[in-house]
Structure formats: C-alpha cells, structure tokens
Amino acid sequence: MSFHQVEEWFEIFRQFGYLPGFILLYIRAIIPVFPLALYILINIQAYGPILGILISWLGLISGTFTVYLICKRLVNTERMQRIKQRTAVQRLISFIDRQGLIPLFILLCFPFTPNTLINFVASLSHIRPKYYFIVLASSKLVSTIILGYLGKEITTILTHPLRGILMLVVLVVFWIVGKKLEQHFMGSKKE
C-alpha cells in the first residue's frame, strides 16, 4: 500500500463526516481489539489534531461509559457476582471504596491500563455513575491528548529521528508505569 493510497483512504473517511471517527472509538471502547493509539492516530490524520482528539475523546468516553452502565445494570447477576469474588477484583473494589476517585483518575489517565477491568470494578464498587462519568471524562481527555500528541508525532519520525526516539521512550515509560500500577492495584496474576 502506497502513501497515496493511504491518503485516499483518509479522504474517503473524511467524506462521511465525523460519525465514522466517533463510531470507531465508541466500538473500540466496547471491544478493545487494537491499540487505542492506532484509532486516535486515524482520527488525527483524518480530521486534524484538535478535531481528531475531540472526536476520539467523545467516542471513547461514550463507549467506555456504555460498558460501565451495562455492567452496573448487570451487577446482581450470577456471572457478575462470580467476577466480584475474585481476589484481584475484591482488592481493587476495596481500594476504590477506601481511597476515592483520585486513584481511579490516575489509573484511567494511563493509556496502557486495562480499562475494561477498571470499568467492571467501578461498576461493582459504590461509586455513583455521575462521579464515575466525571472521572472518566477528565482522565480520558488526558489520555487522549497524550496519545494524540504521540500519534501526531509519528509522522515526524522520519524527518526528526530524535523526536521518534523520545516518543518511544515516553511510550515505554507509560507502559512500565501502567504495568506497575496494574500490579500494585490488582495484586498478583496467579488468580
């Protein structure tokens, strides 16, 4: 696939307006198959940095909050009760209930934390939906801006190799910090 073909795909994407970019991130929040940075990069390339980040953020928080509300609705089902009994989930619920919303905000700010698990746990905790939405919206704005900036910089790797190296270092640091936070809050993986 050539650069010209990629540009044609972005042009087709743009012709459908902002809805495809929104739907792309909405579905990605519900079914996290590919890296979030990839979807944000697609939106930035299609709509520009500011609109791309805004559309990505709106799609991401809409999809993530939808998952949260579905889980909240199903909290008393047998399957959710079994999930709630897991040690890692109990530990995270207890931590969120004790410490409040700030640790949740910090966890959700990092692009490489398991958002699906955090959604499940938040729906099982005693956090009210409106407070979770505020934390979700603000933390995902931070996360989307970070990923959007890093994604925007991907196009300059060839012209400015030092920026590419710096971007790679920042991504690795985010990944390591996210994994450390995940281990700290969720305990061992031997469950």
From Swiss-Prot:
What residues form the membrane-spanning segments? 22-42, 50-70, 101-121, 131-151, 157-177
Q: How does the protein associate with the membrane? A: Multi-pass membrane protein
Keywords from UniProt, A to Z, are:
Cell membrane, Membrane, Transmembrane, Transmembrane helix, Transport
Cystine links in this protein are none
Q: Does the keyword Cell membrane apply?
A: yes
Instruction: Return any one Pfam family short name.
Output: VTT_dom
- The answer to whether UniProt assigns keyword Lipid metabolism to this entry is no
Residue ranges that the Swiss-Prot or TrEMBL entry lists as coiled coil: none
Q: Which GO terms describe its cellular component?
A: plasma membrane
| Phenotype of null mutants | Deletion of the gene does not affect amphomycin minimum inhibitory concentrations. The triple mutant lacking uptA, popT and SAOUHSC_00901 is not viable.
Origin superkingdom? Bacteria
Give the UniProt subcellular location, in the record's own words: Cell membrane
Q: Which family does it belong to?
A: Belongs to the TVP38/TMEM64 family.
Record function comment: May catalyze the transport of undecaprenyl phosphate (UndP) across the cytoplasmic membrane, from the external side to the cytoplasmic side.
This chain belongs to the protein called Putative undecaprenyl phosphate transporter SAOUHSC_00901
Name the lineage.
Bacteria, Bacillati, Bacillota, Bacilli, Bacillales
